[in-house]
Amino acid sequence: MNVNIDSEQLFTEEKPKDYAQPEVLCHTFELLSNLHKLLPNRTVEVLHSYRSEEDKRKCEKPEFSGRKILARHQLPKEINLSPKPSHVPSWKRKIINNISGNWKKCRLWQKSIYEPPMGTIIVRWTKKNLQPSEDLKSVIQRLSALGPIISVTPCGRESAVVVFRDAASACKAVSAFQTMSADSMFHCSWQHRFMSKNKTWSRRYPSKIHAEKKEKHP
């Protein structure tokens, strides 16, 4: 590669240049660009190593590019291939979706960078013809008896997001209204991902476990 650089421009002492002038700035850019072309380039060296003498002569013509030269040498296809996307089986994708679904979604309570307070629950209620109809006001009155409520966000006609001041009050609400029945026409569940996880306890030898605890802590 022939690059014309005047050595006198590099080593001759000159007065400080005013780079505010477009001509000086353009001249400096061209000089640095020419110097950059002289730096060693490993990729170009590899490309030149695959060239034959005939290729070197033809490469002077604009219709011959480096891509055509590489294609003529039949290099491995892997050098131009991007990695394939990872294929997730349908059964594994379903498990991942179920884990993500533990975060109970609400149209007005979207998942964001922060998690809801520990005392946040989702309240759902239904209406029946033979039972007094529940509404948001009556549901909040019943939940207020379990503890102080910070905020209430309606989420549809028959659901809302309720935030208690403390997690103990939320525990009472979830324990008292786990399932809908004839007496209770509304249901409470956890909004926080940690609190909504199902926890299984050992029921096989409960008496043995309690006995071991008593021995360790008399």
From Swiss-Prot:
SUPFAM superfamilies, A to Z: RNA-binding domain, RBD
UniProt-recorded Gene Ontology molecular function terms: nucleic acid binding
Domain of life: Eukaryota
Xref: InterPro entries: RBD_domain_sf, Tex56
Database matches in Pfam families: DUF4523 (PF15023)
Name of the molecule in the record: Testis expressed protein 56
Organism: Rattus norvegicus (Rat)
Species classification: Eukaryota, Metazoa, Chordata, Craniata, Vertebrata
